[in-house]
Amino acid sequence: MFYIDNDSGVTVMPPVSAQRSAIVRWFSEGDGNNVITWPGMDWFNIVQAELLNTLEEAGIQPDKTKLNQLALSIKAIMSNNALLIKNNLSEIKTAGASAQRTARENLDIYDASLNKKGLVQLTSATDSPSETLAATAKAVKIAMDNANARLAKDRNGADIPNKPLFIQNLGLQETVNRARNAVQKNGDTLSGGLTFENDSILAWIRNTDWAKIGFKNDADSDTDSYMWFETGDNGNEYFKWRSKQSTTTKDLMNLKWDALSVLVNAIVNGEVISKSANGLRIAYGNYGFFIRNDGSNTYFMLTNSGDNMGTYNGLRPLWINNATGAVSMGRGLNVSGDTLSDRFAINSSNGMWIQMRDNNAIFGKNIVNTDSAQALLRQNHADRKFMIGGLGNKQFGIYMINNSRTANGTDGQAYMDNNGNWLCGAQVIPGNYANFDSRYVRDVRLGTQSLTGGLSRDYKAPSGHVITGFHTNGDWEMQGGDDKVYIRPVQKNINGTWYNVASA
């Protein structure tokens, strides 16, 4: 076997072209309507590759001078991987004990056991505990001779000459005595109590599951004595409390590995204590509510919608500082009834004038309608009420309304209107008049009188003065300098000081 070795060949096998037909075809010399078959490059390359791979599998190098290499390759492959008739399966023996056992089991020939028939070794021993050896007829005879010298099984003890002595020799006398009053295993009725004086337990076992009741008590001085209940196997067993009335059964409580479910109302006279950070939970509808204590604060928490048994969401409606007891709210508070507080403070903020519109402050949530009155703060008295509030888009101030009033209106008010004017429905009575005295005229008078003369026909009193009288020597011709007038200044009193007024 050899490959193409002239210059017409290539060194790399060309890719095999796609299959043209699924029909098996054969060579033809062109007889009849058939053309002469042309195998083509693919067919020769495939045949050469198959032959060369066969030699490679057998470990034989192609030799152009030898014409039996294909036969030698097939023979070598068979010798390496096949059992030869002439060797009588010696190849398996040579492979070792494990290979021999595997070969037997492949033929369904096993070593004999209690559960499977198969090959077994014989023994004549009568004292062997082995369960893999088979007894010979000799061993069986020895055992039968021994048995014949003993009590016959088919006599069921009838051949025992002294049965009471036999029971006594077996130490069964006390057992027989107890059996007379024993509880039957298939059911019985007790007229008295059942007492366990040791660590015995009461157990129910079904399949691989069990339920047990026991009592732990190491000594009379044991301070950790308790009665225990246990179910077990794969963790799916649990305790169930239920009640039955007539034909109706009602589940009351389930206790599983990780949770106690109370299915009816629970009335607790003592404390309900949770040592988990998350305590009481109410899971109803889409949302869950629970109380959480993280060590520093105690929170009222909510879950996301649709996850009422899940963890808490980002809302913090209310929390209590564990150290100070201070209550904080993170989502606002709506109160329909009265609210009582010793002190009330606003977390105020600073800013520019225009920002006062949005600062934290006490404010009415609803805008005051035009021409409608709204009180923001109110103080109740025995016969009247005082309010801070206003009239929509018109006024804001302090108002008083008597309890006896039936018609709309107020009984007293002092307010600022929408133009910035401050109006008071009655007198403004200051507690200190100093501010008023320094600004307003308290009194007006005529000042000290003086005489001025030399009147002319166009005389005018000095600025801020008035004429109070005339003086003449007899004739009043208002010339010559002998006619005169008396004048006094007009004065005003401001804050205790007299000032002369000026003319316009």
From Swiss-Prot:
Disruption phenotype: Viral particles lack tail fibers in inversion-defective gin mutants (blocked in G+ orientation; no switch to S'-U').
Keywords from the UniProt entry: Host cytoplasm, Host-virus interaction, Late protein, Viral attachment to host adhesion receptor, Viral attachment to host cell, Viral receptor tropism switching, Viral tail fiber protein, Viral tail protein, Virion, Virus entry into host cell
Keyword match Transmembrane: no
Domain of life from the UniProt record: Viruses
One cellular-component annotation, GO: virus tail, fiber
Main location: virion
Induction record: Expressed in the late phase of the viral replicative cycle. Expression of late genes is activated by the viral late transcription activator C. Expressed alternatively with tail fiber protein S' (associated with tail fiber assembly protein U'). The switch from S-U to S'-U' occurs through inversion of a DNA segment called G by the phage invertase protein Gin.
Subcellular localization, as worded in the UniProt entry: Virion; Host cytoplasm
GO biological process entries: adhesion receptor-mediated virion attachment to host cell; symbiont entry into host cell; viral tropism switching
Cross-referenced PANTHER family: PROPHAGE SIDE TAIL FIBER PROTEIN HOMOLOG STFQ-RELATED
General remark: The orientation of the G segment is defined as G+ and G-. G+ orientation provides S-U fibers whereas G- provides S'-U' fibers. S-U and S'-U' dont have the same host range (e.g. respectively E.coli and C.freundii).
Similarity comment: Belongs to the caudovirales tail fiber protein family.
UniProt function note: Component of the tail fiber that acts as a receptor binding protein. Binds to the primary receptor, thereby determining the host range. Two alternate tail fiber S and S' proteins are encoded extending the host range of the virus.
Official protein name in the record: Tail fiber protein S
Organism: Escherichia phage Mu
